[in-house]
Amino acid sequence: MATRRRTAIAEALTRLLPRVPYLDAEAIRAAAGARHMRDLSTGAAVWLAALAHIRHAHTDYDELRDEGYERDEARYFVLDDTNRTLERWGSVRRLQSVEDDDPAEADRIDP
């Protein structure tokens, strides 16, 4: 990953989630810098990476999927937990619905 993009990701993460724990920040930075995120703005890549990390590491999302829930159903059930984590980490943004983390809408998410 180019140094300029890496720096921009770190800055966007600090703006979006000022109180994110270090290990979580490392995972989010790595995901935001992944090849499939390159076409997104830096802010959108960080936002989507943060949502995915929170969903998989800090909610029951994976367990719900293992129990047979569809993706959007599982996302709906972990929406409140996701928002609580965003609040704890200092984000002023919240998810209103499961569509708020749709990659098709990501470029309008810049912090």
Language model segments and positions:
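Structure-specific DNA junction-binding interface
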Residues: 1-111
